[in-house]
């Protein structure tokens, strides 16, 4: 009897879905990593450097001490009864852990919580949002999630009814969006960021793409904006954000604001402004614009990817729609409690009067300053290489250089049945052990080629990364020179 489950009888939406950040090149890298373990010395490098994904602690970044102290005490509250605890943990981490435990049913991080998350933790997040923006925030608008990604899936599930429902997505884009739209059976409507203006978002182009989609019978439901940009690293100007908000209001679009890199800004002339702040600054209220804002504990200076914490905040949705959002959230019961606690700590960190503040601030400032130096070093190194141009990384955790490949390399890629930038990235991996993501996995202007590289290898390893990359690139260009 034939297998009851085969590729040709799977859900076609699953087959259509792709996620390049953990695609073919990463799978090959994992095979090479196993080879290094079982056959040391068999490859021209001795380690795999995963520069494909924003996963800071996997590349050596240390967690923030205050956050981990609070988590440890919440996970093992019996420690709070021991006298020696006062010599091992700061006074404010002890007091914060006690406050948080008092909010949790049964004082147990292994218990289920309310489907939106623990109310006291949502209160703390709302307070942090209000402090950041200068406008009130409400805990009832906040849904705690296992990272930001489940919140994106939830909204796609809510908004997409069939293949004629479209979502405007920036190109280049984070593949979560194309994958989620495909899984839920919708249409991705691309709008192109302008590489020549530092990956600028031009509402005139968004308008053009919107009108084109509507002319094809697509009902465009929402606009995705990623700020700071992933994979492109730009930070939107405040004036640009005002234009975007007005555009969404005028066109009747939900604004999906991916703001998970809000702490990652490396240039003095740019500042993060949340879209919630922009909406309220324009005087828009609940009747004017549906807005969903995403935040995560995985990025920023904290980099707690494996803890799976995050939230989305909804404003501008009617009570009946909110009931449906809550219903979808309830199907998953709740997000993990550790991630919920971390999200509250990220949005409500130590204050200047707290015992931990000096060490917390030193850790935060040190991490962000080092990331800025690494971004600048990689940008400078890539711009020195033949055929590569790299815009300034104003924020986020990546550089996204454009690479002008020789025609012979493009032909070799075609013969190998690969996109030219994927061919380049695969050769880079096999020669150096460095893992990057080809630009074709994010979308790009047709006829251009890019790759995304994280800025996350530890600072003392950056010179070696640059050296290995430079040697490879020069050899590659010589091999395929026209």
Curated annotation (Swiss-Prot):
GO terms for molecular function: L-alanine:2-oxoglutarate aminotransferase activity; pyridoxal phosphate binding. Pathway: Photosynthesis; C4 acid pathway; Amino-acid degradation; L-alanine degradation via transaminase pathway; pyruvate from L-alanine: step 1/1. Gene3D superfamilies: 1.10.287.1970, Aspartate Aminotransferase, domain 1, Type I PLP-dependent aspartate aminotransferase-like (Major domain). Its cofactor is pyridoxal 5'-phosphate. It comes from the Eukaryota. Keywords: Aminotransferase, Pyridoxal phosphate, Transferase. The modification N6-(pyridoxal phosphate)lysine is found at residue 299. Its EC number is 2.6.1.2. Belongs to the class-I pyridoxal-phosphate-dependent aminotransferase family. Alanine aminotransferase subfamily. This is Alanine aminotransferase 2.
């Amino acid at each position: 009897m034939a297998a009851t489950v085969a590729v040709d009888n799977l859900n076609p939406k699953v087959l259509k879905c792709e996620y390049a950040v953990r695609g073919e090149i990463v799978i090959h890298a994992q095979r090479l990593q196993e080879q290094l373990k079982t056959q040391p010395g068999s490859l021209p490098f001795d380690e795999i450097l995963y520069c494909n994904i924003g996963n800071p602690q996997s590349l050596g970044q240390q967690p923030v001490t205050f956050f981990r102290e609070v988590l440890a005490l919440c996970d093992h509250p019996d420690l709070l009864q021991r006298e020696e605890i006062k010599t091992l943990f700061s006074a404010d981490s002890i007091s914060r852990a006690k406050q948080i435990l008092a909010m949790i049913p049964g004082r147990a991080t292994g218990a289920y919580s309310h489907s939106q998350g623990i109310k006291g933790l949502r209160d703390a997040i709302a307070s942090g949002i209000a402090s950041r923006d200068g406008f009130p925030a409400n805990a009832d608008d906040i849904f705690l999630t296992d990272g930001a990604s489940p919140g994106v899936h939830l909204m796609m599930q809510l908004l997409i009814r069939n293949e004629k429902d479209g979502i405007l997505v920036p190109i280049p884009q984070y593949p979560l969006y194309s994958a989620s739209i495909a899984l839920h059976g919708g249409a991705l409507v691309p709008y192109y960021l302008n590489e020549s203006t530092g990956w600028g978002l031009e509402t005139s182009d968004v308008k053009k793409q919107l009108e084109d989609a509507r002319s094809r019978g697509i009902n465009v439901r929402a606009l995705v904006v990623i700020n700071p940009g992933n994979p492109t690293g730009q930070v939107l100007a405040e004036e640009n954000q005002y234009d975007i908000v007005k555009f969404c209001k005028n066109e009747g679009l939900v604004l999906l604001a991916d703001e998970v890199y809000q702490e990652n800004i490396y240039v003095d002339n740019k500042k993060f402004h949340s879209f919630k702040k922009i909406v309220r600054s324009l005087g828009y209220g609940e009747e004017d614009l549906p807005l969903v804002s995403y935040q995560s504990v995985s990025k920023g200076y904290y980099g707690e990817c494996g803890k799976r914490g995050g939230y989305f905040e909804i404003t501008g949705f009617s009570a009946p729609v909110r009931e449906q959002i809550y219903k979808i959230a309830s199907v998953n019961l709740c997000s993990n409690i550790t991630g919920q606690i971390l999200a509250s700590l990220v949005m409500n960190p130590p204050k200047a009067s707290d015992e931990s503040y000096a060490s917390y601030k030193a850790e935060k400032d040190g991490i962000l300053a080092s990331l800025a130096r690494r971004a600048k070093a990689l940008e400078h190194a890539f711009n020195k290489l033949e055929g590569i141009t790299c815009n300034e990384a104003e924020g986020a955790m990546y550089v996204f250089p454009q690479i002008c490949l020789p025609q012979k390399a493009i032909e070799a890629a075609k013969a190998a049945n690969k996109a030219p930038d994927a061919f380049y990235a695969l050769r880079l991996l096999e020669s150096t052990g460095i893992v990057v993501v080809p630009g074709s996995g994010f979308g790009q202007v047709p006829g251009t080629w890019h790759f995304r590289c994280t800025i996350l290898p530890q600072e003392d390893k950056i010179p070696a990364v640059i050296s290995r990359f430079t040697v490879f690139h020069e050899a590659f260009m010589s091999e395929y020179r026209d």
